Structure formats: structure tokens, C-alpha cells
């Protein structure tokens, strides 16, 4: 009986030392998540998690070219336009390329709405094509937004190379006339 009492006392002492100390409560850090959408409010370039270039009318007018393709080739490093050989109607259509990908992988928007593709489908022998950017006059542009990263999750498979959004001037009256020499 004495042994049982002694062993119970020893067990109580050991169990008392094995009690975990009470730790102060640690504040849980909450990770900030940015959610963006097509119909959300406009955001500035510095708030964007992806590479977005925004060119205002001053930047567009400062380039010495008047063709929209040439203006974008000057301002956007990953923008390219290739001329087709003189053999058929493909000579007259110059769709945009971003990041060296095919022309149908660059989404072109005008005032945030999809631009229709060119009617000629045989460009470069691939059977696919993108919109002809040369049909958008540079004098009608208010600004150009270029997303130089894949946006297929947001816009679909035609935005794998990136997205170009042309914002047109919203003048309801009047017009403009410019001469470059």
C-alpha cells in the first residue's frame, strides 16, 4: 500500500512538470488578396500586379509616325507587325503581335469591347488572323492600354499573348485637322 501511495505521488509530481506552459495568443496574419474584374473601377498602373502600359494622347502625339502600327512599334517593346509578301490580300492586312506569338493570340479591344477580326483568314499560312490595327486612325486615339502578359483566364484564349485596348476620343461635335511635314 505504501508503494502505491509513493508511486502515485511520484506520478503526480512528474505529471505536474509535464504540463505545457501557457503561451500568449499569436495574432494571425491575414494575407491581402487583390481581386480584379472586367467591370471594376479603373486602376492605375502602379496598383497593377501585371505589366500594363498606358499611353496618353501626349505620348501618342510625340511619336513621329501617324500610322497606329508604327506608333505602337515605337512605344511598346514587345509589339511587332510583319508585312506579308506581295502575293495576295494579306499584303494589306497588318495584324498585331505581342511577345512573338501568333497574331490571333493578341486580343484587341476598342473602348473595352472586342474588335472584330479581319476578313482575310490566310495570314502566314496558319489560317488564323487578328484584327487589322491599321484601320484605327492614330488621330482618333485618346489613349492606349497594353497588357503585356497573358490574360487568357480573364479574356479567353485569344488573349494569351496580351491585350491591347484602344480608347477613342469622345468628342461628340467638331473634329480635328493636323498636318505633319
PLM features per residue range, with description:
Residues 1-29:
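Cleavable N-terminal targeting peptides that direct proteins into the secretory/outer-membrane pathway or into
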Residues 52, 60, 72, 144, ...:
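Non-catalytic regulatory/gating segments with a bias toward low-complexity or hydrophobic composition
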Residues 70-71, 75, 96, 132-134, ...:
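N-terminal periplasmic accessory domains that precede
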Residues 29-31, 48-53, 92-94, 102-106, ...:
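Envelope-exposed proteins and targeting segments
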Residues 113-148:
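Short acidic/polar hinge/loop motifs at secondary-structure boundaries
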Residues 73-117:
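Extracytoplasmic beta-strand/coil segments of soluble accessory domains associated
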Residues 32-63, 69, 90, 119-125, ...:
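N-terminal periplasmic "start-of-domain" segments of outer-membrane beta-barrel proteins
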Amino acid at each position: 500500500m505504501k508503494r502505491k501511495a509513493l508511486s502515485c505521488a511520484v506520478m503526480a509530481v512528474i505529471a505536474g512538470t509535464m504540463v505545457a506552459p501557457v503561451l500568449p495568443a499569436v495574432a494571425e496574419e491575414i494575407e491581402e488578396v487583390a481581386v480584379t474584374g472586367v467591370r471594376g473601377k479603373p486602376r492605375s498602373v502602379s496598383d497593377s500586379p501585371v505589366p500594363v502600359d498606358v499611353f496618353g494622347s501626349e505620348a501618342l502625339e510625340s511619336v513621329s509616325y501617324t500610322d497606329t502600327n508604327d506608333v505602337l512599334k515605337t512605344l511598346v517593346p514587345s509589339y511587332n507587325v510583319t508585312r506579308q509578301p506581295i502575293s495576295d490580300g494579306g499584303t494589306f492586312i497588318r495584324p498585331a503581335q505581342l511577345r512573338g506569338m501568333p497574331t490571333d493570340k493578341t486580343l484587341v479591344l476598342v473602348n473595352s469591347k472586342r474588335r472584330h477580326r479581319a476578313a482575310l483568314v490566310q495570314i502566314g499560312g496558319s489560317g488564323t488572323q487578328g484584327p487589322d490595327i491599321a484601320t484605327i486612325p492614330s488621330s482618333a486615339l485618346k489613349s492606349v492600354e497594353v497588357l503585356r502578359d497573358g490574360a487568357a483566364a480573364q479574356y479567353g484564349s485569344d488573349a494569351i499573348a496580351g491585350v491591347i485596348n484602344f480608347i477613342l476620343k469622345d468628342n461628340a461635335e467638331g473634329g480635328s485637322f493636323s498636318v505633319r511635314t
